[in-house]
Amino acid sequence: MMLKPSIDTLLDKVPSKYSLVILQAKRAHELEAGAKATQSFKSVKSTLRALEEIESGNVVIHPDPSAKRAAVRAKIEADRLAKEEEERKIKEQIAKEKEEEGEKI
């Protein structure tokens, strides 16, 4: 049985089989968790989708994993702060509308 993408083409993209397996597993978990895909897929399974992305060069090993983790944490924090700000604005708007409604009565 011939697998697509082939191991030979995948090993051209990453330095070792170990690195390939780790990269594929991490990307498959990201896809399962709802990460945006970088392309359209032929495969249904997230593990094979990850291999397709690796083959196309859309997913690569980050040269500095600790920097990537820090960037991910920073993005999560920025998203959290943006959500809190949006909720604060909504609460202010609701309070303002209630105040205006109270003045009309």
Curated annotation (Swiss-Prot):
Matches recorded under SUPFAM superfamilies: RPB6/omega subunit-like
Known EC number: 2.7.7.6
GO cellular component, one term: DNA-directed RNA polymerase complex
One of the GO biological process terms: DNA-templated transcription
Domain of life: Bacteria
Catalytic activities: RNA(n) + a ribonucleoside 5'-triphosphate = RNA(n+1) + diphosphate
GO MF annotation, one: DNA binding
Pfam families: RNA_pol_Rpb6
Family per similarity comment: Belongs to the RNA polymerase subunit omega family.
Entry function: Promotes RNA polymerase assembly. Latches the N- and C-terminal regions of the beta' subunit thereby facilitating its interaction with the beta and alpha subunits.
Designated name of the protein: DNA-directed RNA polymerase subunit omega
Source organism: Streptococcus uberis (strain ATCC BAA-854 / 0140J)
Underlying gene: rpoZ
